[in-house]
From Swiss-Prot:
It is found in: Plastid, Chloroplast. One of its GO terms (cellular component) is chloroplast. It comes from the Eukaryota. It holds the Pfam family Ycf15. This is Putative uncharacterized protein ycf15. Belongs to the ycf15 family. Keywords: Chloroplast, Plastid. Its main location: plastid. The keyword Chloroplast applies.
């Protein structure tokens, strides 16, 4: 998620709302847009379609 605050663009993790990168607004607006990552997304199954108890490959380890 992008957040504009004090003339800067901040990219936030939508789950934690933790900001991890900031750009001056004008630098962000002048930059080239990144390539879409739709080609990479198809390589990974949706978690709703995977039962982690049946397939340990997709299980998340709890710390």
């Amino acid at each position: 998620m992008l957040l504009l605050k004090h003339g800067r663009i901040e990219i936030l993790d939508q789950n934690t709302m933790y900001g991890w990168y900031e750009l001056p607004k004008q630098e962000f607006l002048n930059s080239e847009q990144p390539e879409p990552i739709t080609h990479s997304i198809k390589k990974f199954p949706l978690m709703k379609d995977v039962n982690p108890l049946e397939n340990q490959k997709y299980a998340c380890l709890m710390k």
